[in-house]
């Protein structure tokens, strides 16, 4: 498959395609290292590195954007540069500590564990992106932009839920190992209440956020916020069960549930966007995440 194929698929120039693949190659190294830090409760180093990346990204972006007329390209490449530099450092660090590139036992285990997760993560990408693509193709670009604004505001809670899940996952694994199931139950109930309240607050104040930050032509987005904000609760609900499936290496169940949810989202969008317009995509998203969470 040549570069022209990827250019046609993503509708992007070659240098941005290469930048994207470089980021995909190096970003996992930081993910591997950060997961180790979380599981060993070594948060000081993780927080320090995260702050360094958070500062380097915008600072380099400002410098590069102000230094060229190609503003958008400069911002993208500066962001990729930061990710690649940090990723390269952690790749070298991991390889140095591991001192061994190939180990048949671990490679086989990693392949068997992660192979079913490839369709799972592709399906999750479909669930997150297909709405806007289908609205763009079936209704129009402006409606896709309005939906995108509503989706961004509605999913603000994901910043919180992702941090909560990253912290809760090591605790879950260690509690299962110690057979301390009661602590998992009590903390799970508490954080579910916190997330539910957060989603309700987004529903309540999301329209005000749009009215303040977006021009009038985007005000129609307020009707999409409630279902998409409710979807965030079920996005968070799934990993609580999924982490347990991961612990017991039952990744095939995760794959099947996510694939069903992704296919259902495409079908429901195709049917209901034609009938009710682009607003229907918010409700099909909610229905599919509910289906995904209970599957």
What are the functions of these language-model segments?
Residues 1, 154-178, 188, 242-247:
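Helix-loop junctions and terminal segments of transmembrane helices
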Residues 4-20, 204-233, 239, 279:
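Interfacial segments at transmembrane-helix termini and the short loops linking adjacent helices
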Residues 17, 141-152, 221-226:
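Small-residue hotspots at the loop-to-helix junctions and early N-terminal turns
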Residues 18, 47-96, 259-264, 278-295:
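Hydrophobic alpha-helical transmembrane segments
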Residues 26-48, 94, 98, 229-260:
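Membrane-interface junctions at transmembrane-helix termini in multi-pass inner-membrane proteins
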Residues 44, 48, 72-79, 88-128, ...:
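Interhelical loop/hinge segments that connect adjacent transmembrane helices in multipass membrane
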Residues 111, 148, 179-205, 222-225:
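Interfacial transmembrane-helix starts/ends
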Residues 116, 131-133, 143-161, 190:
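Alpha-helical transmembrane segments of polytopic membrane transporters and translocases
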């Amino acid at each position: 498959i040549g570069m022209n194929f990827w250019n046609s698929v993503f509708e992007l120039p070659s240098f941005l395609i290469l930048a994207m693949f470089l980021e995909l190659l190096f970003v996992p190294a930081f993910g591997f290292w950060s997961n180790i830090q979380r599981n060993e409760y070594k948060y000081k180093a993780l927080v320090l590195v995260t702050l360094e990346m958070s500062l380097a990204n915008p600072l380099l972006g400002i410098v590069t954007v102000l230094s060229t007329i190609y503003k958008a390209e400069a911002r993208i490449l500066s962001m990729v540069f930061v990710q690649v530099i940090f990723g390269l450092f952690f790749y070298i660090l991991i390889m140095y500590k591991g001192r061994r590139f190939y180990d048949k036992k671990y490679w086989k285990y990693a392949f068997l564990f992660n192979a079913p997760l490839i369709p799972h993560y592709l399906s999750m990408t479909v669930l997150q992106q297909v709405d806007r693509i289908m609205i763009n193709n079936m209704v129009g670009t402006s409606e896709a932009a309005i939906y995108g604004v509503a989706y961004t505001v509605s999913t603000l809670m994901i910043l919180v839920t992702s941090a909560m899940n990253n912290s809760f996952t090591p605790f879950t694994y260690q509690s299962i190992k110690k057979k301390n199931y009661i602590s998992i139950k009590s903390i799970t109930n508490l954080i579910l209440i916190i997330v539910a309240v957060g989603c309700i607050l987004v529903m309540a104040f999301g329209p005000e956020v749009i009215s303040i930050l977006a021009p009038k032509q985007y005000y129609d987005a307020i009707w999409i916020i409630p279902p998409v904000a409710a979807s965030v609760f079920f996005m968070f609900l799934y990993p609580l069960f999924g982490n347990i499936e991961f612990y017991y290496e039952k990744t095939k169940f995760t794959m099947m549930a996510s694939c069903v949810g992704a296919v259902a989202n495409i079908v429901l969008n195709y049917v209901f966007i034609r009938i009710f317009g682009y607003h229907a995509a918010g409700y099909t998203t909610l229905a599919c995440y509910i289906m995904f969470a209970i599957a």
